[in-house]
């Protein structure tokens, strides 16, 4: 769930990387954290479980600018891929504002991809959410492998929500940042619609940076009409002087 800190002028969004075990979720986050400027990222935290890890850190991308005059911060999370860590996946998924589903492009991994995708739908359903209303990006990872399925075939089998898709080789960084940037833009666009916040010139919407859009200044009231001229008073005539007194006898 989006958190808006008006005191810090900051918007916090949670993005979750979902997918089967060893599909490349952890690699995606490690690449982003390694290449992001030190001033724009928090500490990479890892919670180790047997055979898998949950990673998370804060990331403030420069290229997305501000929304409603506020900085945007994204909290990036991965979930453990193994089926027996479903309780952890549910916990990490709570409050998510968008999801990157990382699929393994190898044909022998298709069943695991579909099982994990169905699990994502079920866990969101328990929270009263669906992927049709949540920002979703699909990443076809491991495109460098010789047996990788064609993107069209992956799309036909997995993309029933018509989500944006990206090809990737996460170990080399290829496709990692375009995937993240697209999801971040989708989340901010949804935020604009729900909260009426509009982004600056570098934001997802490219609209005015003030909340609710720029307002035109009110037109100045016309000046009051001048007062009517005062009526002229007739000039006063001084009375004639009194006659002189008569001479004495």
Give the ranges of each region predicted by the language model.
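Amphipathic helical hotspot of TIR/SEFIR-family domains
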Residues: 108-130
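Canonical P-loop GTPase G-domain recognition
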Residues: 137, 143-197
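Conserved G1/Walker A P-loop phosphate-binding module
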Residues: 1-49
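Conserved catalytic network of the ASCE P-loop NTPase/AAA+ motor domain
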Residues: 8, 52-55, 65-70, 90-95, ...
């Amino acid at each position: 769930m989006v958190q808006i800190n008006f005191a810090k002028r900051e918007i916090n969004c949670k993005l979750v990387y979902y997918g089967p075990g060893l599909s490349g979720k952890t690699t995606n986050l490690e690449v982003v954290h390694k290449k992001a400027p030190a001033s724009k990222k928090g500490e990479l935290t890892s919670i180790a479980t047997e055979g898998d890890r949950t990673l998370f850190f804060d990331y403030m991308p420069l290229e997305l600018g501000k929304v409603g005059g506020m900085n945007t911060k994204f909290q990036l999370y991965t979930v453990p891929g193994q089926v027996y860590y479903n309780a952890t996946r549910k916990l990490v998924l709570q409050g998510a504002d968008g999801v990157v589903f990382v699929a393994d492009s190898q044909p022998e991994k298709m069943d695991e991809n579909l099982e994990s995708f169905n699990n994502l739908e079920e866990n969101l359903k328990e929270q009263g959410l669906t992927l049709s209303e949540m920002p979703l990006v699909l990443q076809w990872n491991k495109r460098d492998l010789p047996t990788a399925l064609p993107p069209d075939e992956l799309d036909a089998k997995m993309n029933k929500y018509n989500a944006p898709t990206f090809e990737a080789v996460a170990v080399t960084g290829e496709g990692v940042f375009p995937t993240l940037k697209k999801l971040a833009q989708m989340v901010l666009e949804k935020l604009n619609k729900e909260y009426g916040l509009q982004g600056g010139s570098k934001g997802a919407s490219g609209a005015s940076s003030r909340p609710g859009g720029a307002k035109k200044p009110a037109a100045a009231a016309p000046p009051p009409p001048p007062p009517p001229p005062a009526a002229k008073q007739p000039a006063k005539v001084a009375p004639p002087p009194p006659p002189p007194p008569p001479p004495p006898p």
